[in-house]
């Protein structure tokens, strides 16, 4: 159903649904606006298991389009991943291509933990981010990485749109030819 464009209300409603047996998937239209809902996320969503000695769960998914490349200025270009990486009690999905997005979202829908699902806006409608799904039942487990190329001189860890920028850099330096 639709809700008012009030991020704290969106998250608060999702919490209520999640703790009563539903699996809400909500969207914060731009991740830049998630900050008004942080009290709900920090004090309710991510601490639910801890506060209840693992008796309660809050299985919700928060979709949050992030990042720049759309000339959106300061209110439509923020990346919130660094903040959430340091918040225990929530899983993070930040896919770099279409099949990973589908596999992670399907997996998130099966979990009993809260997930923040970050979608880099710079990947929307980009041919280089398209990918064939391995099969219709494809699930991508959380906590796994993808090794694009391997070597013994340098390690680069990237996610979202930066995976594609990293691949470009590897090719431009000729490191993919080794």
What name fits each language-model region?
Residues 6-9, 15-157, 162-165:
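Conserved thiamine diphosphate
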Residues 1-2:
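Short pre-catalytic strand/loop immediately N-terminal to key active-site residues, enriched for Gly-Thr
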């Amino acid at each position: 159903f639709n809700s008012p464009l009030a991020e704290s209300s969106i998250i608060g409603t999702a919490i209520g649904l999640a703790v009563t047996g539903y699996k809400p998937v909500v969207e914060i239209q731009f991740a830049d606006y998630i900050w008004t809902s942080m009290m709900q996320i920090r004090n309710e969503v991510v601490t639910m298991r801890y506060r209840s000695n693992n008796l309660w769960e809050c299985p919700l998914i928060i979709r949050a389009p992030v990042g720049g490349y759309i000339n959106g200025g300061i209110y439509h270009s923020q990346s919130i991943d660094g903040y959430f990486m340091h918040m225990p009690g929530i899983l993070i999905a930040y896919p770099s291509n279409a099949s990973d997005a589908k596999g992670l979202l399907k997996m998130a829908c099966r979990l009993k933990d809260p997930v923040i699902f970050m979608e880099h806006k710079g990947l929307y409608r980009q041919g280089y981010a398209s990918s064939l799904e391995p099969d219709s039942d494809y699930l991508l487990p959380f906590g796994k990485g993808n090794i694009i190329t391997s070597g013994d001189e340098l390690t680069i860890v990237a996610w979202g749109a930066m995976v594609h920028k990293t691949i470009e850099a590897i090719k431009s330096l000729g490191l993919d030819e080794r």
